């Protein structure tokens, strides 16, 4: 019934098993991959024909985590998986990026890749198995695909590279780098690093590419024994006559458009050229598909821009290959925000805002490997007006989530540890103008906003987006690329870091001829650009502000006996709720007895601290307290000296003379000074007004003058 093909291989410390032919047989391709109990199912379905008028490649990649993979039931009312989590979105992008460039030009058939996580080993992240399984599923499907693709995660500790480190190793690693590529070339890099050098980063990329060959070879074996016949697909032949005609009608105007340095003027001119060519073709009686004409014009644009750069001519905006666009920086832009910065680089601009919160503001993430809390959030938004367009405004798209994550990776290594700066931090980057490199503008603006908020970052962090154009043996590396250069180039990569090293590196490579030497040149030029931007940032803001904004919460920490936590919380939370409401403070209690009090009011914090210390204080024998008389008894009175701490004031301890009536000396609600004489094994306390007055040097208490009072005194003496 099943033609099941299985391939097993050892990959570093992991045993991997790939199989096809048993599950999801109606898909174009399906592979089940097991990597030390992390199991993923990757499926591929490709449409046999492209839709009429299709002018782009409709590839979708969906990475889906099932909670049963971790033996859990989803939370919420409906008890089933809902919208994709941030991790699912980021992993979908991670898989998409190296696969997309390997489909042939002109292939516009719809392709859907779906990866389900069916079982999770908490120590083995599922992203690498998912990427390898997706590549294998495409390879066995027979679709036109220039793969297979391999992938590997690389760590770095004590001068050694680690292959596919587990989560415990990653927690202590100075590097978390994912690299994907084919047998011959690297296609994608995504990484976070603890200020590592360009040499170490490039070495990690090369090491990962070497180690992924094990997985690529296993995929070849799987295809040889279990692959489906290759599709009989051929790209449509080029209409050379149409290419020549479009070139004749539009080339000169396109060249003129690319002499315009301002993006808006250039974009408008290009639209006019496209419309003009279409109109002239119609006038000439040339029948042509509009999509085909647009593609020819785009190819002409690409040749113009690439040719100018490779010939040493100025770039689109007039710069040479190494120059960073003009930078303008302004901090404290928003009066009520805790920290803010406006970072402008050419026609790219980011308004980044920092907000400080308490531990209760941390994001709680219910991941497959277990719940954890995140004290640093970075959210990136790019509304359509940033590019002078109209469009949908709403929940963030995949691109926005990915750009936010990249900027976050760049800043994490310089953040202070929680015991140095206990605040929860949220950065929001609002892209108000975009012409390339908006994620790196978010890094620069984010660092400045943190410093403006008074966050003691370890160093300035800057980011720069780089491009590369390769034709045969000629290549050019571009610093601080524009949006058009991004689309027309062969590689774009983003590097962020400090004066000391790289904190984040992202590469996307569209061709397979880029060597280690070319990447070395590109990284060296990126460092030059990064240091230039860092110089501008350091001149604008040399260090973090020493004082927090007056609108930011202040925090103090109180340590109590963990057994007293219930007293602070109170029955049904009554005590903590009253404290929060009456003092206007946010109060967070940890299991170890650490209490954090946060408020914009120093008076409110002081009052909350005083009351918490009162609730949790231990009564000390021999200490004098101001107490409140709660109840009178025939033989004395009950006095409250601390919250929840009542003691007996015996009649003999009220005054030196004989006391006949307790009410002659103290009243309910009266404040009295009492000394704690002793506490028995049951916690019962003996109090004394006599001893307190004697120690403090006051005149001994006497009863109010009343009939018989003098006799009582003489009798006691």
UniProtKB/Swiss-Prot annotation:
Mg(2+) binds at residues 486, 492. It is found in: Cytoplasm. Keywords: Cytoplasm, Magnesium, Metal-binding, Nucleotidyltransferase, RNA-binding, Transferase. Its EC number is 2.7.7.8. Involved in mRNA degradation. Catalyzes the phosphorolysis of single-stranded polyribonucleotides processively in the 3'- to 5'-direction. NCBIfam families: polynuc_phos, PRK11824.1. It catalyses: RNA(n+1) + phosphate = RNA(n) + a ribonucleoside 5'-diphosphate. PANTHER family: POLYRIBONUCLEOTIDE NUCLEOTIDYLTRANSFERASE, POLYRIBONUCLEOTIDE NUCLEOTIDYLTRANSFERASE 1, MITOCHONDRIAL. Pfam families: KH_1, PNPase, RNase_PH, RNase_PH_C, S1. This is Polyribonucleotide nucleotidyltransferase. One of its GO terms (cellular component) is cytosol. GO terms for biological process: mRNA catabolic process; RNA processing. It comes from Ralstonia nicotianae (strain ATCC BAA-1114 / GMI1000). Its main location: cytoplasm. The lineage of its organism: Bacteria, Pseudomonadati, Pseudomonadota, Betaproteobacteria, Burkholderiales. HAMAP family: PNPase. Residues 690-717 are annotated as: Disordered. Its cofactor is Mg(2+).
